[in-house]
Amino acid sequence: MTHITSRKHAPRVSLLATATLAAGFAPLVAQAADSADAGSRNATELDKVQVRGSWFNPSSPKFTAELLDTPKSVSIVSEKLIAETGATNLQDALRMVPGITFGAGEGGNPTGDRPFIRGFDSQSNVFVDGLRDVGSQTREIFDLEQVEVVKGPSSAYGGRDSGGGSLNLVSKTPKLKNETSASMGIGTDSYARGTVDANYVLGDGIAARLNLMKHESDIAGRDAANVSRWGIAPSIAFGLNGPAQLIASHYHMQSDDLPDAGGFPYGNPNGAPASKWVDGRPMVPDRNNYYGLVDRDFQRTRADISTLDASYDFGGHKLRNIARLGNTSNDYLWTQPDDSQGNPNNYGTLWRRTNSRAVDVKSFADQLGLTGAFQTGALKHSYSAGVEYSDEKMTRGSYLMTPGTSNPLTGNSKCPTTGAATGYNCADFANPNPRDPWAATHSVYRSDKALDVEQRTKTTSAYVFDTIELNEQWMVNLGLRYDDFRTTLTTPVAGAAPTRVRNSNDFLNYQAGVVFKPAANGSIYLSWGTSSTPPGMDGGDGSDGLSAAVADLKPQDTKNLELGTKWDLLDNRLNLTAAIFHTVMNNARVTIDNGTSQNAGKKEINGFELGFTGQLTDAWSLYGGYTYLDSELKDNGFVCAVSGRTCPSGIYVPSPNNGNVFPNTAKHSANLWTTYRFPIGLTLGAGAFYSDKQYGDVANTKWIASYTRFDAMASYAIQDNISLQLNVQNLTDKTYFTKAYASHYASIAPGRSATLALNVKF
């Protein structure tokens, strides 16, 4: 077996290299009528709108109408908004979209991307340029043009889906223009970041683009933890000025972090008597406390993704094939604080439990599609049709320790004392020392690769979309997708044959909407969509895994009814949207009264969204939104009426959690970001972000409090091509939590940080 020596992370050194949402508000019909004379939105007008920073249309060819006329809630975070707010990863960018929260610690992703959209876990619903991006990751933004959030059941667009929505990350590609931009930033907490984005025209219709990134920093308001990553993304395009185009690209990113789940245990752990409980909130003796170990904990990730995108425009119809090979790895060993053992309540100490994983995901995906427009009589059609195939292979091991992490004085996880006698597996809850010499008496090694678990997932799909323009006021949007989904989990057994668990399902999903246009610059729509969530949809590297208990079950089915409206106002300077929706899952996987898992549960969510984005004047831009989510676990199955891990037959009773709200779901959330550019070259910006109370568990006993966070930005144009930008995040140094784990802990947000970047364009 291979032995691993955990290294102490070195001090940071300064580095270098370079670095909306089209959602809205209720329509004001009187103002809408004033803008109606603008007429229909032709290509020239669309260019004008995008220059103003108003509507940004989705990149996916499966959207067969402009965003204004698409009967679905879609939020887009533009590259400009990402840069203004100082975002450096996907989680930073998504705070601009209300209705998205983040989960903690599940499925091999302790500190990575686990977004919840409209109350549903969407970790496995992330796409890059329309192809599913498998493998747990913390995604960077240095190679992104925009982030698209499709809300509501989306299986008609992407196949297997959790029911809340999906994310599509749009990569930067070459263009016929010579330009280079670079950004070099420093900041508090040893922050150093550099990015370069260089685009060159190489010949007739040929261009190349190179994006580079290096990032290092500590975590604001946290001891010990730090991040270190770098990335490179080259691409080349042929035929940019003709009907036949070919784009080849590669994305590489790797990180080596001292991970910080930001974990603080809840005040009501199972391991302590109720008389010593505080309440369901996390206990925080000092926000800076880091309960991990510098000489033990690590997280190392790597992503290599190669893409070939070929297309031919026949004139009115376009054939496109995009193929991708992906290889990602995520190796980590990190400290989970106390694991509900109750040591902080009982003794004022904490047990340093470890979580580890060594996972590799290899994937191939190919999508062949045809898009275009045609007319049948008086009906105008805009269509998209295609087929897809994907093959994903996940292998998963872990890291082991000698000796283990139990307290040698008690032989278990109880920690009446701390220090060397406990092998430093027990720490002082109020004053932990992350530099305890744990490695002096312990070793870490990778588990036997021959015993790695493997999950293989293959999917074959076909889809068709059509937007039918009946007349100037009425449109119909239809979409249909078929998926054949097959996944197998293989678990090796030493000295015996491996065990295998399989799930094979095919499912049909659809999207249907009717759009009424009372004016050329507005729309009112009613839509209906579905999604399917099969067992093992995460491919073995997420929070919805395959097991013998669920292998024979059908997919969970989610349906969504949505009524919404979208408007362009003030000569397309302001875009407003509003939507109300009802989402229900009628066959959720739950335990029934004989102790088995069945598709017998029900949960639903009713919600309301408002949003606005626009360039109100040449100097003033505004972006914001509000989301209301009223969730309920209608039928959460049955639970054992007696304590113990084995329940006698006939002792199951209806779940006491029936009627509770969804975990990781904020009832109210809102955000506002605005900038104003003064004639002297100075631009000032400010943002406010609100999230309501969230529960971590279905019992609604573990929770994190509501919070409001403020950010600020100032930039100054030294010359036309040189500027300085200052960002201050969490301006008031608010102590708050962003992620609530189901049982053990919650993740604290970073404290106040400030960064200053020099941005150059030439």
Predicted regions and their residues:
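Outer-membrane beta-barrel translocator/receptor signature
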Residues: 142-145, 156-232, 240-244, 304, ...
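Acidic, small-polar-rich N-terminal luminal/periplasmic segments of exported/outer-membrane proteins
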Residues: 44-177, 563
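Acidic/polar loop-and-plug regions of large Gram-negative outer-membrane beta-barrel proteins
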Residues: 215-220, 227, 232-239, 243-311, ...
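Structural signature of Gram-negative outer-membrane beta-barrels, strongest in the C-terminal barrel
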Residues: 237-243, 361, 380-392, 453-585, ...
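Conserved C-terminal beta-signal and adjacent last beta-strands/turns
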Residues: 6-9, 18, 359, 371, ...
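Gram-negative outer-membrane beta-barrel transporters
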Residues: 473, 579-584, 599-698, 732-733, ...
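Surface-exposed extracellular loop regions of Gram-negative outer-membrane beta-barrel proteins
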Residues: 256-267, 393-395, 486, 515-562, ...
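Membrane-embedded beta-barrel scaffold of Gram-negative outer-membrane proteins
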Residues: 309-324, 328-334, 524-525, 554-637
